């Protein structure tokens, strides 16, 4: 799964696990530079332990989990401690992964039942041999209307719960215009990561006012109230946005 940050690639992997009723496990590959982190250390080394693949399989408690390889494009190649990308070839290649060898266990382990889902921002940074062993699915960025629905259905309820505000308050409203202004004037991204942070920031300010005044500070959040709470917007919608030139 490849696409810009914040578009839900990792969340999509978790949803795949839920829909298949399989265990879910995630392994971040960002900054991985040592092959032994994949294959494990031989027992002759002090502090030796199994590789992260086997440790995560153990953590899942299942031989057929959905295994997320997060940020596979960030793996370091050709280091003095071995090439992690080459070790991942054995993990992902169906011709080899039925007998994946972990140095600590000193035995082969069958990974063929595992569903590996890799995520990346830039597929050009992934070594070609690895890329050839994966099916590529692009996860594109969201348009404003999609972000509004994501914020309304998922982000706002989640952050309301996190900040302890009364989510059942009958008069509390977050207008569509406020969502649109938040998206277009306070964030500039393909995904919704910064949008979630801005919603959290806004609700923390409301929670503080509620704690001080013992009542919900604003019954309705509109674009004007938005500026009062978050200050002047750092971005402005492009004048020609939406035009055909």
PLM region spans:
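Conserved C-terminal "switch" segment of AAA+ ATPases
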Residues: 61, 122-132, 136-197, 205-218
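AAA+/SF3 P-loop NTPase mechanochemical coupling elements
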Residues: 60-68, 100-120, 170-173, 219-221
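AAA+/P-loop NTPase substrate/partner-engagement loops
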Residues: 18-49, 56, 76, 146
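Conserved catalytic/switch belt of AAA+ P-loop NTPases
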Residues: 69-109, 113
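The Walker A (P-loop) glycine that initiates the GxxxxGKT/S ATP-binding motif of P-loop NTPases
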Residues: 3, 40, 71
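Short loop/turn elements that form and flank the Walker-type P-loop nucleotide-binding site
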Residues: 7, 20-21, 39, 47, ...
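C-terminal engagement/docking regions of AAA+ P-loop ATPases
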Residues: 193, 197-245
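Walker A/P-loop
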Residues: 1-29, 58-59, 89, 93
């Amino acid at each position: 799964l490849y696409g810009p940050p914040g578009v839900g690639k990792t969340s999509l992997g978790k949803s795949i696990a839920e829909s298949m009723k399989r265990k879910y496990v995630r392994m971040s590959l960002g900054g991985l530079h040592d092959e032994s982190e994949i294959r494990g250390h031989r027992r002759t080394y002090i502090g030796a332990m199994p590789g992260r693949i086997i440790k995560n399989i153990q953590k899942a408690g299942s031989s057929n989990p959905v295994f997320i390889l997060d940020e596979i494009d960030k793996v370091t190649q050709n280091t003095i401690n071995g090439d992690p990308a080459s070790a991942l070839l054995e993990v992902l290649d169906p011709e080899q992964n039925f007998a994946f060898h972990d140095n600590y266990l000193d035995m082969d382990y069958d990974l063929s039942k595992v569903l590996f889902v890799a995520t990346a921002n830039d597929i050009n940074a992934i070594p070609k041999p690895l890329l050839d062993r994966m099916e590529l699915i692009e996860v594109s960025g969201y348009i404003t209307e999609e972000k509004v629905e994501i914020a309304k259905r998922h982000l706002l309820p989640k952050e309301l719960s996190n900040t302890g505000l009364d989510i059942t308050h009958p008069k509390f409203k977050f207008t569509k215009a406020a969502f649109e202004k938040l998206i277009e004037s306070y964030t500039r991204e393909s995904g919704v990561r910064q949008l979630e942070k801005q919603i959290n920031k806004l609700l923390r300010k409301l929670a503080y006012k509620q704690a001080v005044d013992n009542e919900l500070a604003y019954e309705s959040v509109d674009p004007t109230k938005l500026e009062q709470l978050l200050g002047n917007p750092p971005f402005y919608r492009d004048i020609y946005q939406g035009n055909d030139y």
